[in-house]
Amino acid sequence: MSVSIKPLEDRIVVKTLEAEQTTASGLVIPDTAKEKPQEGEVLAIGPGRVDDNGNRVPVDVAVGDVVIYSKYGGTEVKYAGQEYLILSARDVLAVVQK
């Protein structure tokens, strides 16, 4: 999926993955009981931040990676009818290995 949002510096555009609809035992989770998702697919990355010496520090994730991010990290944006999350690289906690 290509997105026409180009993040600046060390920011990352993420499409949030939907939270589980049922528990492992098959119980349906109502919308009011669902927690905010913390997992998403990276759709775009910025060029990286500039350090104190003027060198560009690249972001540690790549487009297509599935990442786990801070629960309250990022800014939710709606663009072209889709909802995205724009995170700082510091808000990314891990890359999911499949």
Curated annotation (Swiss-Prot):
Together with the chaperonin GroEL, plays an essential role in assisting protein folding. The GroEL-GroES system forms a nano-cage that allows encapsulation of the non-native substrate proteins and provides a physical environment optimized to promote and accelerate protein folding. GroES binds to the apical surface of the GroEL ring, thereby capping the opening of the GroEL channel. Keywords: Chaperone, Cytoplasm. This is Co-chaperonin GroES. Belongs to the GroES chaperonin family. It is found in: Cytoplasm. The keyword Cytoplasm applies. Pfam families: Cpn10 (PF00166). It comes from the Bacteria. InterPro entries: Chaperonin_GroES (IPR020818), Chaperonin_GroES_sf (IPR037124), Chaprnonin_Cpn10_CS (IPR018369), GroES-like_sf (IPR011032). It comes from Beutenbergia cavernae (strain ATCC BAA-8 / DSM 12333 / CCUG 43141 / JCM 11478 / NBRC 16432 / NCIMB 13614 / HKI 0122).
